[in-house]
Amino acid sequence: DELVAEAMRYYYFIKKGGFTATGGEPLLQAPFLTEVFKRLHAERLHTAIDTSGCLPITPAIDTLLDHTDLVLLDVKSVDDDQYATLTHGSRATNHAFLSHLQERGITTWVRHVLVPGWTDDDAMLHRLGQYVQQHSVVERIEVLPYHTMGCYKYEKMGLPYPLADVPAP
C-alpha cells in the first residue's frame, strides 16, 4: 500500500514514464512486485523491470511478466566465457530470459555496459547487434559507460572487486 501510494504521488508529474523496479535483482521479489504492478496498472501507471535476467523463469516470474509493460535487460556479454568471467553465472540463463520475453511479446530494452578492455571492442559490439536483431521485442539498445560506483559494495562485504584494475573512462 505504501509503495503504491508513494508512486501515485508523482502520477501527475509523469508524462511518459512510470514505475521501474530496479536495484539488486527485482525478480527475486516477484510475488511482491506482482501485487504492486497489479495495483499500479489499476491506476493506469506504466510498469517496468530492470533486470540482469540471471534467474530461470518460474511461475512467479511469469505471473509478474503478465503485469510488466517493459523489461530493461542487462546483457553483460554475448560471449559465454566472458559472461561467466564477468558475472560468475551462465549466459544461457540470460539468453533463455530474452527468448522468453520474445515468446511472450514483452517490449524489451537491452542495456550493455562498455567495460574497457572487456566488452568494448568492435567485434563484440557487432556480435551484440547481431544477437539483438534476432529478437523483435527489443525496441532499443542502450550502450552505457562503465563506472566504478559499485566498488564500495564489494569493500563492505570484504570481497575483491573483480574489475578493480579497470579504470572508468
Regions picked out by a protein language model, each given a short descriptive name:
Residues 1:
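Cys/His-rich short segments
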Residues 4-149, 155:
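Conserved AdoMet/S-adenosylmethionine-binding subsite of the radical SAM
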Residues 155-164:
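Short glycine/proline- and charge-enriched loop/turn segments
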Residues 134, 166-169:
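Short, intrinsically disordered, charge-balanced linker/junction segments flanking boundaries
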